Design a protein with these regions (language model features):
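Cysteine-centered iron-sulfur cluster-binding motifs in ferredoxin-type domains/subunits
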Residues: 31-51, 75-102, 111, 134-141, ...
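Conserved oxyanion/phosphate-binding beta-strand-loop segments in alpha/beta enzyme cores
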Residues: 1-8, 45-50, 179-195
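Active-site-adjacent bridging/hinge elements
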Residues: 16-25, 59, 64, 85-86, ...
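Iron-sulfur cluster-binding electron-transfer modules in prokaryotic oxidoreductases
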Residues: 102-447
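Non-heme iron-sulfur electron-transfer modules
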Residues: 2-21, 46-82, 94-124, 429-440
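Secreted/processed peptides and extracellular or luminal domains of membrane proteins
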Residues: 44-50, 54, 87-93, 98, ...
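Short, intrinsically disordered, charge-biased short linear motifs at domain edges
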Residues: 22-35, 66-81, 227-229, 359-363
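A generic structural-conservation signal
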Residues: 47, 57, 90-91, 235, ...
């Protein structure tokens, strides 16, 4: 047997509807097998807290072997995994097609699904993962202002700590006064659709919960870039949460319901020749990877997968097609750019970095790229139990992002961006300005 893979990793479909998937004994046996291999390798120790937790458990046994770890302690490892997928995509030498067939993230997902089925996921965690529920207040006059103001008070944060398990010091997004999908044209078809070799000539925007409820400006910036490049677009006429927060809980039935709400709508756009673009990497990843692996035989799901683009994957491909304008006018100066985990594991390359370098051919851009997990990881970074760990994981990123006192810090993941800004401020190296990459490209165009 060869030591490690010489081939690109492949992913097996998630056999989540097989009764054995939820069999705890079977899952624990597989965890012991995988943990034993991980213990003998330890390449992933610098990623999330799952691996230090596992290795500490092993090292505390009498003989330093996995068989000495009590099975009930395995769940400590599971709880620290936030499904970033970096171990699978960037570190593990034993992923399929290797004979050892390791898929650590999906094994952790299986364990989380077992916990969820057993009723061991708290109501607090379920509420935090219900983005459409707490986003429902967005855009309601007076209510938005009241909720945002209250959530900034120490009293409210103490209540959120006890009632919702949200750490008092964790950054929390505010609700938007105007939702992205409200009070605006839902399409611009004034331009003809010009297909390129690599890109469809028209775009369907999946707005995402975060852009719709929290930072609609990111969506507006995307639209400005499409308009400037004369690319017709539509905002998809109906959407629900992509399901990523529920996936992180192991609530696969809720993910399936999200799929049933979204895929028929998105498949129509895919079949009509649209590129489907989402400005949140986790949402893009759900439609590119996780939902297709859960429903490998669903033709509509596979059609959506093929049509789904990260924004800069689309714009860079558009440039290679000779169909992107490069009339940049405004220098960006020093930019510290963070590549988020769920952007990296899409296996599309560093497309946002490529875009910044393209801008730098016309105007000044001094780019500092940081390629490491920020530690935020969706709801993980705001939870009382994990926020201090999330800040610890992010420390190398906070330090690297502060290099050369950048004019802007930026991340494709807006949540990671705010987490990094908080960490930099706590380290005494506060960022001058936090801007999403789409916002910076809009600035560079002078729009």
């Amino acid at each position: 047997m060869r030591e490690g893979n010489l081939e690109a990793p492949t992913r097996h479909p998630l056999d989540w509807q097989n009764p054995e998937f939820h069999d705890e004994g079977s899952a624990l046996k597989e965890m012991e097998r995988v943990f034993d291999i991980c213990h003998g390798c330890r390449r992933c120790v610098s990623l999330c807290q799952s691996f230090p937790t596992l290795f500490d458990l092993v090292d505390a046994t009498d003989d330093g072997e996995v068989h000495g770890v009590k099975k009930e302690a395995y769940w400590k490892v599971v709880d620290q995994c936030y499904l970033c997928d970096l171990c699978y995509m960037t570190k593990c030498p034993y992923t399929p097609p290797h004979a050892w067939n390791l898929d650590f993230p999906h094994l952790m997902l299986r364990a989380k699904a077992i916990k969820h089925q057993k009723g061991e996921v708290s109501a607090k965690e379920k509420f935090l993962a219900s983005t459409d529920t707490h986003g429902s207040f967005a855009g309601i006059p007076i209510v938005v202002q009241a909720v945002n103001a209250i959530n900034k008070t120490k009293t409210a944060r103490k209540v959120m700590d006890s009632a919702l398990g949200v750490h008092p010091d964790a950054w929390m997004p505010t609700l938007a006064a105007q939702r992205f999908r409200w009070g605006r044209a839902m399409s611009n078809t004034a331009f003809p659709a010009v297909n390129g070799q690599r890109t469809p000539g028209k775009v369907a925007i999946f707005s995402t919960c975060y852009v719709n409820y929290n930072e609609p400006g990111i969506g507006e910036d995307l639209i400005k870039l499409l308009d400037h490049n004369e690319i017709p677009y539509v905002i998809v006429d109906k959407e629900s949460c992509c399901g990523m927060p529920k996936l992180e809980l192991g609530d696969l039935q809720s993910v399936a319901r999200s799929k049933e709400a979204n895929i028929p709508v998105l498949a129509r756009y895919a079949q009509e020749g649209y590129a489907i673009v989402s400005a949140v990497p986790s949402c893009t990843l759900m439609f590119k990877q996780e939902i297709p692996l859960m429903f490998p035989d669903c033709a509509d799901t596979q059609a959506v997968k093929k049509a789904m683009f990260d924004p800069f994957e689309y714009f860079v491909a558009r440039h290679k097609d000779g169909l992107l304008k490069t009339d940049f006018k405004a220098a960006l100066g020093k930019v510290s750019y963070h590549i988020p985990c769920h952007g990296r594991v899409q296996n599309i390359g560093k497309k946002t970095e490529e875009m910044f370098k393209l801008i730098g051919q016309t105007v000044e851009v001094k780019l500092n790229t940081v390629e490491r997990c920020s530690g935020h990881a969706g709801t993980y970074g705001v939870k009382t139990a994990y926020h201090p760990v999330a800040m610890k994981i992010g420390k190398p990123v906070f330090k690297a992002m502060a290099k050369d006192e950048p004019d802007f810090i930026s991340s494709d993941c807006a949540l990671a961006g705010h987490h990094i800004a908080q960490g930099m401020a706590q380290a005494g190296t506060p960022a001058k300005a936090l801007q999403h990459p789409l916002s910076l490209v809009r600035r560079a165009y002078g729009l």
